């Protein structure tokens, strides 16, 4: 794939065969569309869906809970970390959320003001805190790295555009140039989906640890990666 990459203060544009993905900073006016793509991208993802599958009597109730959870996670994360959206033919197709070395971590207060009360009402305070503890454990390995790092928190691609190279393009032609242009030389990422492992290794990440984490009676895999630029 041959891309022309145009970088300005706020926008990166990729052109391939006259198709264009324009990356820009997320702004509130895109919230409804971005939340739709973000929500649809992570259906069945182990950390956000799988650990709760046995908790609800119907898939409809599970879906309702999942949507509340994932929207709250998005809103909490973008309070601290940079969010970029890839727009193609006027539609949001890709979402990239990245934590810079200077960013403060997302904390309980960020979640509290982003809809956490609705989660507590459905699964209780104790299980909510246990879930937050599980989420923290997914990042223990990468947070132990002493060098300054850029962390790819989320890479979401609209399901209608998956397997078309959008995810790889977001890493190779947007994220890596973004990090390099800001003086960075290390990117980390974690995933809880085994099918994502070859995606990241094929895009230049090195697997540094594979582990199993527990939440109540459920277990999920956790894979941690780094890319040295």
Residue positions per predicted region:
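Conserved acyl-donor/pantetheine-binding loop and adjacent beta-alpha core of acyl/acetyltransferases
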Residues: 95-156, 214-216
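Conserved GNAT acetyl-CoA-binding A-motif
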Residues: 149-150, 179-192
């Amino acid at each position: 794939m041959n891309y022309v990459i145009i970088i300005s203060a706020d926008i990166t544009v990729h052109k391939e065969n006259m198709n264009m993905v324009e990356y820009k900073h997320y702004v509130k006016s895109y919230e409804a569309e971005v939340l739709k793509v973000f929500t649809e991208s992570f259906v069945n993802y182990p950390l956000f869906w799988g650990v709760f599958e046995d908790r609800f009597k119907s898939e409809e109730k599970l879906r309702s809970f999942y949507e509340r959870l994932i929207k709250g996670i998005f809103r909490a994360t973008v309070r601290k970390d940079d969010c970029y959206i890839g727009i193609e033919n006027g539609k949001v197709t890709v979402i990239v959320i990245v934590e810079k070395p200077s960013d403060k971590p997302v904390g309980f207060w960020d979640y509290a003001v982003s809809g956490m009360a609705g989660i507590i009402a459905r699964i209780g305070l104790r299980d909510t805190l246990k879930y937050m503890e599980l989420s923290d454990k997914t990042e223990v390995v990468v947070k132990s790295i002493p060098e300054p790092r850029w962390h790819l928190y989320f890479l979401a691609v609209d399901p209608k555009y998956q397997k078309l190279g959008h995810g790889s393009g977001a890493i190779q032609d947007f994220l890596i140039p973004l990090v390099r242009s800001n003086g960075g030389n290390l990117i980390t990422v974690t995933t809880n989906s085994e099918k994502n492992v070859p995606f990241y290794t094929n895009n230049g990440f090195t697997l540094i640890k594979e582990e199993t984490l527990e939440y109540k009676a459920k277990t999920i895999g956790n894979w941690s990666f780094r890319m040295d630029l």
